[in-house]
Amino acid sequence: MNNRVHQGHFARKRFGQNFLNDQFVIDSIVSAIHPVPGEAVVEIGPGLGALTEPVAARMDHMTVIELDRDLAARLASHPQLKDKLTIHQQDAMKVNFSELSEQAGQPLRVFGNLPYNISTPLMFHLFSYTDAIRDMHFMLQKEVVNRLVAGPNSKAYGRLTVMAQYYCNVIPVLEVPPTAFTPAPKVDSAVVRLIPHVQMPHPVGDVRMLSRITTQAFNQRRKTVRNSLGDLFTSEQLIELGIDPILRAENISVAQYCKLANWLSAQSTPQK
């Protein structure tokens, strides 16, 4: 039997499809999400409905975003789901989540078993809509979850860490083995909960500046920040901001990156 076929559907590599089939894991994820009728629940990549069915069973209605035309059609004709779902057959990277929230009249609860080949860019896309999102629960590669929850001074700590923790409180929920999927991926997985901050712990005036600094620092993570950020800050300026110039990107906290971004924004703003 072809191990890429599950419930009559051939898993497409280009969509990064791995279908969840472990009932204990499914129940654990649904319990973690804890959907309640009346909430604006949105699933990204419902696939064959492993999570959609138990979540929809608790709901009067939910929205799903599915790129695969065949899977979207299956959901549209599913006897238990078709009357409960609004189906968007499109790329989640192109979805305006603020519009979905406005239509629902409340912040969104977003979840999904994300295709591993797009999980990082998709999270960056979602971070730009955190004002419209109440919380997010995602199945990801365990390595990505480790990066999301990492602290400074570790190899896992990177730009994704800083930006995720700037926008959200990040909480690991559950580790998931490859055997929970068809076809089995070659990596371990994990579920993570991301709750957008109601009040930013480290407010930044211009998030583009934070993105620029973290990109530049972590693209040259083995260099000291005196070198990697040398075109933006002098060593003296770094010291004034409480940062040792011989530190590397991974040694600087989220709060310190936010401080750098705000300082640089202030220098770029014309004085009145």
From Swiss-Prot:
Key word Methyltransferase present: yes
Entry-linked PANTHER family: DIMETHYLADENOSINE TRANSFERASE, DIMETHYLADENOSINE TRANSFERASE-RELATED
Top EC class for this record: transferase
Gene encoding the protein: rsmA
HAMAP family the UniProt entry points to: 16SrRNA_methyltr_A
Pfam families per the UniProt record, alphabetical: RrnaAD (PF00398)
Alphabetical list of NCBIfam families matching this protein: ksgA
GO molecular function terms listed in the Swiss-Prot or TrEMBL record: 16S rRNA (adenine(1518)-N(6)/adenine(1519)-N(6))-dimethyltransferase activity; RNA binding
Recorded family membership: Belongs to the class I-like SAM-binding methyltransferase superfamily. rRNA adenine N(6)-methyltransferase family. RsmA subfamily.
Entry's localization field: Cytoplasm
Source taxon at top rank: Bacteria
EC number: 2.1.1.182
Functional note: Specifically dimethylates two adjacent adenosines (A1518 and A1519) in the loop of a conserved hairpin near the 3'-end of 16S rRNA in the 30S particle. May play a critical role in biogenesis of 30S subunits.
Record carries keyword Aminoacyl-tRNA synthetase: no
Full protein name: Ribosomal RNA small subunit methyltransferase A
Cross-referenced InterPro entries: KsgA/Erm (IPR001737), rRNA_Ade_diMease-like_C (IPR023165), rRNA_Ade_Mease_Trfase_CS (IPR020596), rRNA_Ade_methylase_Trfase_N (IPR020598), rRNA_adenine_dimethylase (IPR011530), SAM-dependent_MTases_sf (IPR029063)
Catalysed reactions listed for this entry: adenosine(1518)/adenosine(1519) in 16S rRNA + 4 S-adenosyl-L-methionine = N(6)-dimethyladenosine(1518)/N(6)-dimethyladenosine(1519) in 16S rRNA + 4 S-adenosyl-L-homocysteine + 4 H(+)
This protein's UniProt keywords: Cytoplasm, Methyltransferase, RNA-binding, rRNA processing, S-adenosyl-L-methionine, Transferase
GO cellular component: cytosol
Residues noted as binding S-adenosyl-L-methionine in the record, renumbered to the chain: 18, 20, 45, 66, 91, 113
SUPFAM superfamilies: S-adenosyl-L-methionine-dependent methyltransferases
